[in-house]
Regions:
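Long, mid-chain structured domain cores
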Residues: 1-3
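A recognition module on extended beta-rich or small alphabeta surfaces enriched in W/G with H and D/E
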Residues: 87-88
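Short, charged surface segments at domain edges that flank catalytic/cofactor-binding sites
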Residues: 5-49
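Histidine-centered nuclease catalytic patch
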Residues: 50-82, 92-97
């Protein structure tokens, strides 16, 4: 009936708003995706070149090239591997380190 259809439309619009929100984008960052990006980037920081091969205990993080806070999405082409030092200094700036 029309009431159910209207409720469904409201439900879908809320889901779309969430998926575009910062929280929605961060929720898309799964451990599987993090691992995939690190493997793609050969476990190497795209900024300074530090790698776990040279520094076995190096903390690597996945960074949004265009920050979520500036409209960036959690997609493979907007993600890169950075060491913790480079990621902290980058913050939410848009810096192309590739």
């Amino acid at each position: 009936d029309i009431d159910n259809l209207n409720r469904f439309v409201v439900y879908l619009s809320e889901k779309i708003k969430f998926s575009k929100s910062v929280a929605g984008q961060r929720a898309l960052m799964t451990s599987k995706l993090r691992q995939h990006i690190k493997e793609r980037d050969h476990f190497t920081c795209k900024c300074c070149g530090a790698s776990i091969e040279a520094e076995p205990h190096l903390l690597l993080e996945i960074d949004h090239i265009i920050p979520v806070s500036k409209g960036g999405l959690t997609t493979e082409d907007n993600l890169q591997t950075l060491c913790w030092r480079c990621n902290r200094s980058k913050g939410n700036k848009v810096v192309d380190v590739q």
